[in-house]
Amino acid sequence: MSAGGNARKSTGRPSYYYRLLRRPRLQRQRSRSRSRTRPARESPQERPGSRRSLPGSMSEKNPSMEPSASTPFRVTGFLSRRLKGSIKRTKSQPKLDRNHSFRHILPGFRSAAAAAADNERSHLMPRLKESRSHESLLSPSSAVEALDLSMEEEVIIKPVHSSILGQDYCFEVTTSSGSKCFSCRSAAERDKWMENLRRAVHPNKDNSRRVEHILKLWVIEAKDLPAKKKYLCELCLDDVLYARTTSKLKTDNVFWGEHFEFHNLPPLRTVTVHLYRETDKKKKKERNSYLGLVSLPAASVAGRQFVEKWYPVVTPNPKGGKGPGPMIRIKARYQTVSILPMEMYKEFAEHITNHYLGLCAALEPILSAKTKEEMASALVHILQSTGKVKDFLTDLMMSEVDRCGDNEHLIFRENTLATKAIEEYLKLVGQKYLQDALGEFIKALYESDENCEVDPSKCSSADLPEHQGNLKMCCELAFCKIINSYCVFPRELKEVFASWRQECSSRGRPDISERLISASLFLRFLCPAIMSPSLFNLLQEYPDDRTARTLTLIAKVTQNLANFAKFGSKEEYMSFMNQFLEHEWTNMQRFLLEISNPETLSNTAGFEGYIDLGRELSSLHSLLWEAVSQLDQSVVSKLGPLPRILRDVHTALSTPGSGQLPGTNDLASTPGSGSSSVSAGLQKMVIENDLSGLIDFTRLPSPTPENKDLFFVTRSSGVQPSPARSSSYSEANEPDLQMANGSKSLSMVDLQDARTLDGEAGSPVGPDALPADGQVPATQLLAGWPARAAPVSLAGLATVRRAVPTPTTPGTSEGAPGRPQLLAPLSFQNPVYQMAAGLPLSPRGLGDSGSEGHSSLSSHSNSEELAAAAKLGSFSTAAEELARRPGELARRQMSLTEKGGQPTVPRQNSAGPQRRIDQPPPPPPPPPPAPRGRTPPTLLSTLQYPRPSSGTLASASPDWAGPGTRLRQQSSSSKGDSPELKPRAMHKQGPSPVSPNALDRTAAWLLTMNAQLLEDEGLGPDPPHRDRLRSKEELSQAEKDLAVLQDKLRISTKKLEEYETLFKCQEETTQKLVLEYQARLEEGEERLRRQQEDKDIQMKGIISRLMSVEEELKKDHAEMQAAVDSKQKIIDAQEKRIASLDAANARLMSALTQLKERYSMQARNGVSPTNPTKLQITENGEFRNSSNC
C-alpha cells in the first residue's frame, strides 16, 4: 500500500561537513550494531471503573523497516538500535532513552545519504528479529489475505492510532468475522485506501445525506500527583480504546501536550481519559498502576469552540481529608457536521471556485485569527479538489504583495487569509515530504543526549565550545537534509512556487519571489515543524526542555539562513554561526531555485491523499453563514448571489430529508453504538477472548523496492486456538519471485465485481454472461445493494469484494433479461499500484454518477485504454467476436492489468492453510467446463482464472498461471514508452474538463480485449493467410497513421504560424506600450523637474523676504533700546530730584515746628515779639533766618 515509483538515488552535497564519512566501514558497522532493549510490561490491574488494557505482547511504536528510496537520508545507526531491540512495551511510547551520543548516529546517518545503490541501502538495514517475546512461536504466516465483504451487513472502517499497534498509518476493517488491520506508508495513502473501501461498502455515499462526528482533543498536563514517577493516559471513546499518550516523568507537573484527532466517529456519549502510573522497568512482572479516570460527556464539549478545563480524576479508592486529588487539564471539541448530497452543493462550489478573491477581500477585516484558519483550510481543500488551488494561492499572494508594498519583511508575518491558506496547503500536500526530509533527523535528535545550549548565561564557559560544536553539527545536518530533499519535493508546491516566480517577474519584481518562497516554506512550515514536531505529526511526544531548546536554536539558524540574514547584537551569542550562514547562502539560493523550477515538475509525485469534499463544503458553508451575517449591507451587496446560495443550503440543512435525492438510500450513515458490538476494535477483541486468537504480522511482497510496508493483522477463526504469536519479515535483499520482465505483483487491491442481476427463475447468471453488443448501459453502473457476489482472486493481491446489483428499470429488465452488470474497478490511480514495466493506469472507481465532478475520486481519462480503443479497425467485427467469446473476455478483463506469463501468488483465506510467499507454486488446476454454447473448445486451454462458485473464497482455486497460458497487455508501453515514465502518466495530465463516463471506459476495455483476442487466436483457420491479412492490415493501418500524423503536422505547422503571428502582434503591442509608458515617464519626469524649479524659486524668495524682515526687526530693536536708555536717564534724574524735595520738605516741617513753639512761648509770657524772624529760601531750596544776616 505504500506510495512509490522508481527508487531515486539521492546525492549528497560535497560539502565540508561530510568529514565524518571518512570513518572506517568497520567503525560505522559497529555504530549501527548498537541496540537497546526495552523490558516488557504487562497490562495494568483491573480496578473498578477502569478498562483493561492491551496484553503484554502488543508492540510499541515501531519505525519503518525499510529505507525509503525517496528519502535522501536515513539514521541507520539509530534505526538499527531500535529495530534490534525487543518489541515488548504495552502501555505507550515512552520518551526515548538518552544513553548515547548523537555523534554516534551521525556516520550511519550520512552514509545512508551517500549510498548510491539499492543493495547498499538494503545492507544498511538489519533483519528484524523473528521472536518478539518469550511466548512467541513461529507459525506459518499468510502471505496473501482476502477480505470478503460480499455478505456483510455492517462494515466499520476506521484509522488506528500509532500508539495502539506501534505502527504508523494503520487502519482497521471490522466485519462480523473479526478485524483486520492494514498499514500504509503515509497518512494520505491511508486516507485514500479507507475512502475506497468505504465507497466499496457504500457506493452511493456522495448522493446521500450523512452526518459526520469529529473529535479533537488535547491531553495537556496533570497536577497533584506524586513526584519522581512516570504517568500516561489512555483515551477511550464510549469505552473503546482509541489512543495512548507517551509516558512522562512528574516534575512540577506532568506535561504531555499531545493532541488527537478522530474523524468518521459513531455518535459519542462520553470521552474517558484513564490515568496510569508506570511501574519500574526492572520489575517486569508488575502491572501499571491504575490511578483513576476523567469522564467528559460529549455534549459538554460540543460546538465550534474548544473547551479547556481542569478535570478532577475520579479514583477507585478516594482519600478523604488529605487535600485535593489529582487533576488533568484537557482541551476538547466535539463536532457534528451535517453533509448534504453533492448535488446540493453544486452551485455553492462553483461560486467559491470562481469568486474566491472577492470573497476573501470582503471577509478579511471581520474574521478572527481562528476563523481565518478554519476558512483558509476549507478553501484550500475545496480548491485542491476542483483544481484551482494554484490560482487561488497565486492571487492571494499577489494581493498580499500589493498590500505590503515596500514593507517586504511583513509578508507572511501577519494572520491574514493568505498566510493561513499557504500554511494549510503546505500541511495538506507537504506532510509526506516533511516526514521524508526531517522525520528521521528529528527522531535521532530526540534520541541523542547532545547539549546545544550556547547562551553564556545558561551554561558554563568551559562547556561553551563543545555546545557550539554540537549546535553547528546539528544545523549542518538539518540543512543538509533540507536541501537534498528537492528530489522528493511535492509537485503541487513546485507548481505554486513556479507560478509565484513567474507572476513576480511579470510584475517587474523578480527579487521578491525568492522572499515569498523562502518565507512560506521556512517561516510557516519547516521551521515551525522543527520547533514543534508533535504539532506536525512528526512525532507524538512533546520534547523535553533540552530537546526543545536544541530544536529552537536549529530553527533560529535555519530561519536566518532562509532570510539571508546574520545574527546581530540582539542575539550576539549566536554570532559564531554567521560563518556557516554565509557559506550556505549559495546552496539555499540554489535550493529555492530548484523547488520553483517548472522544468522539473514531471520528476516528482503529486498529492495522493483523499479530501472529503462534502465535509469541507459543509464546514465552509457554516463559516460563511456566520460571517456574512456580520457584514454591512453594502458589503453583502458586492458578494453577488452568495447570500442567496447560502440561504438555500441552510434551508436544505434545516429541513429533514430535504437532502435525500430520489432513488437513493442513505448508505453512508455512520454506524451507531449498537453496530460497534460486532467488533469494538482489535484490542478489545483480543482482550475479551483471553488471547485465544492468533495474531499474525505478515509482510507482503511489494511491486516496487519501496513498497515494503504492508502488514495484515488478522484473527483466526478460533478453530485452532493458540496463544502463540509470530512475526515474519522479508529481507530487502532476499530474492523475489522471478516474474516476466522482472516485474512483481501488480497492485494491492482490486474492488472490481461481477455484478449480477437476477434473471429468469432457476437459471443462475454466471460471471461470463456479458452483453452481446459489448456495451453496458450507463444506468446499470449505478450502485445499489447485492444479493450475491462472486469474489475474484487476483494474484498477489489483497482483495475486497462488495457485490452491488443494479436497480431494475423497465429499460434494462425488459430489453436484456438476465444480463449481469459490470462496474468499473474502484481502485484509485496511484503509480505504486501499477507495474514498473509500463502497465496502463487503472481508472478511478465510480461510486455513483452524480459525484464524478465533485469527488476527489472522480474518474480521469486513461490515455492508454482510449488509444487502444481508437486503433481498432472494425467496431462491428469486434462486437461480433465479443459476443462469441464472452467468457474469455471476462477472464481477460480481470487480467488486463497483468503482464503475460507472470507467475502469480494464490490468495488464501485467513482460516485456511497458509504458505510462505517464497514456496513453489502448486500445479495448475484443471480448466473448468466451458459455459454451454458459449466458448469454443479451442479456447479452453487459454482460460486463466477459473472462478469459484458465488460466496466462496478464492483460496480454493489458486491462481497460478498454467503452462501454455498467454496473456498480452495492450498498452502504449509497447509503442516505445519508457517504463519509468509510465506510472506517472496520471500526474503529467492536466485536469480535464470532461472526463469519460463509465460506459466509454467499459467499451474501451472490452474493445481492447477483443483486439487482443483477434491478435492471439486469429479469425481464420489458415495461419499463412492470417499472417498475410495481418501484414496488409498493418500496412494499411500504418498508412492511415502516417496520413493522420501528416495532417496533425500540417495543423501543428499552421498553428505554429498563427502563434508566431500572434506573438509578433503581442510583441508589437508590448513595444508600443513600452514606448508609451516611456514617453509618459519622461513627461512625468519633466513635469516634476519644472515643479522642483518653481519650488526652488519660491523658497529663495521666501528666504530673502525673511532676511529683510530680520534686518528691519534688528533696526527697530536698536531704536527701541536707545529710547529706553534715554527714558531711563530721565527717570533717574527725577528720582534724585524727588529725593531732594523730600529732604527739603522735612527741614521745612521742622522749622515750622520750631516757629510754632516760639510763638506759643511768647504768648504765654506776655511778651510781643519784636523784629520777627524772616525766613528766606536759598537757591538750594533751604531756609535761612534773616535775623542772622
From Swiss-Prot:
SUPFAM superfamilies listed in its UniProt record: C2 domain (Calcium/lipid-binding domain, CaLB), GTPase activation domain, GAP, PH domain-like
Modification comment: In response to TNF-alpha-induction, phosphorylated at Ser-728; phosphorylation leads to a conformational change, and thus, increases its association with 14-3-3 proteins, MAP3K5, RIPK1 and TRAF2 in endothelial cells; also stimulates regulatory p85 subunit sequestring and PI3K-p85 complex activity inhibition.
Residue ranges occupied by any Ras-GAP domain in the UniProt entry: 387-595
Induction: Down-regulated in prostate cancer and medulloblastoma.
Knocked-out gene: effects: Mice are viable and fertile but show a number of cerebellar abnormalities such as a delay in the Purkinje cell (PC) dendrites development and a disruption of late-born cortical neurons migration. Develope a prostate hyperplasia in epithelial compartment at 6 months of age. Show normal vasculature development but enhanced inflammatory angiogenesis.
One Pfam entry name: RasGAP
Residues where Phosphoserine is found: S728, S747, S978, S995
Topological category with respect to the lipid bilayer: Peripheral membrane protein
Biased composition (Basic residues): 20-38
Site label Arginine finger, positions: R413
Feature: compositional bias, Pro residues: 919-931
UniProt keyword Transmembrane, yes or no: no
Annotated Gene Ontology cellular component terms: AIP1-IRE1 complex; axon; cerebellar mossy fiber; climbing fiber; cytoplasm; dendrite; endocytic vesicle; neuronal cell body
Domain C2: 193-311
Alphabetized UniProt keyword annotations: Angiogenesis, Apoptosis, Cell cycle, Cell membrane, Cell projection, Coiled coil, Cytoplasm, Developmental protein, Growth regulation, GTPase activation, Immunity, Inflammatory response, Innate immunity, Membrane, Phosphoprotein, Stress response, Tumor suppressor, Unfolded protein response
Renumbered residue ranges of the record's region Disordered: 1-75, 653-679, 715-738, 804-823, 843-865, 895-998, 1015-1034, 1163-1189
Necessary for interaction with AKT1: annotated span: 646-943
Start-end of Basic and acidic residues biased regions: 39-49, 1023-1034
CDD domains with a match to the protein in the record: C2_SynGAP_like, RasGAP_DAB2IP
Coiled coil: 1025-1159
GO BP of this protein: angiogenesis; cell motility involved in cerebral cortex radial glia guided migration; cellular response to interleukin-1; cellular response to lipopolysaccharide; cellular response to tumor necrosis factor; cellular response to vascular endothelial growth factor stimulus; extrinsic apoptotic signaling pathway via death domain receptors; inflammatory response
InterPro entries registered for this protein in UniProt: C2_dom, C2_domain_sf, DAB2P_C, PH-like_dom_sf, PH_domain, Ras_GTPase, RasGAP_CS, RasGAP_dom
Domain remarks: Exists in a closed inactive form by an intramolecular interaction between the N- and the C-terminal domains. The proline-rich motif is critical both for PI3K-AKT activity inhibition and MAP3K5 activation. The PH and C2 domains are necessary for the binding to phosphatidylinositol phosphate. The Ras-GAP domain is necessary for its tumor-suppressive function. The C2 and GAP domains constitutively bind to MAP3K5 and facilitate the release of 14-3-3 proteins from MAP3K5.
Function statement: Functions as a scaffold protein implicated in the regulation of a large spectrum of both general and specialized signaling pathways. Involved in several processes such as innate immune response, inflammation and cell growth inhibition, apoptosis, cell survival, angiogenesis, cell migration and maturation. Also plays a role in cell cycle checkpoint control; reduces G1 phase cyclin levels resulting in G0/G1 cell cycle arrest. Mediates signal transduction by receptor-mediated inflammatory signals, such as the tumor necrosis factor (TNF), interferon (IFN) or lipopolysaccharide (LPS).
Protein name per UniProt: Disabled homolog 2-interacting protein
